[in-house]
Amino acid sequence: LECHNQQSSQPPTTKTCPGETNCYKKVWRDHRGTIIERGCGCPTVKPGIKLNCCTTDKCNN
């Protein structure tokens, strides 16, 4: 599986995730504005953080 791993509005980058079946995208807000984190897997998140998990290559941009 290949997942995007750039932060927020950085230029898109990807990484290969051996053995993973999910990519994720987490979105939250703080004093800097909206923060977006992308990567492999499907982590558990605290309340108030939006999480999208998906199962195809580069699906988490």
Swiss-Prot record:
GO terms for cellular component: extracellular region. Keywords: Acetylcholine receptor inhibiting toxin, Disulfide bond, Ion channel impairing toxin, Neurotoxin, Postsynaptic neurotoxin, Secreted, Toxin. Transmembrane segments: none annotated. Gene3D superfamilies: CD59. It is found in: Secreted. Disulfide bonds join 3-23, 17-40, 42-53, 54-59. PROSITE patterns: SNAKE_TOXIN. GO terms for molecular function: acetylcholine receptor inhibitor activity; ion channel regulator activity; toxin activity. Expressed by the venom gland. Belongs to the three-finger toxin family. Short-chain subfamily. Type I alpha-neurotoxin sub-subfamily. Binds with high affinity to muscular nicotinic acetylcholine receptors (nAChRs) (tested on Torpedo marmorata AChR, Kd=0.07 nM) and with low affinity to neuronal alpha-7/CHRNA7 nAChRs (tested on chimeric receptor, Kd=3 uM) and inhibit acetylcholine from binding to the receptor, thereby impairing neuromuscular transmission. Produces peripheral paralysis by blocking neuromuscular transmission at the postsynaptic site. This is Short neurotoxin 1. It comes from Naja pallida (Red spitting cobra).
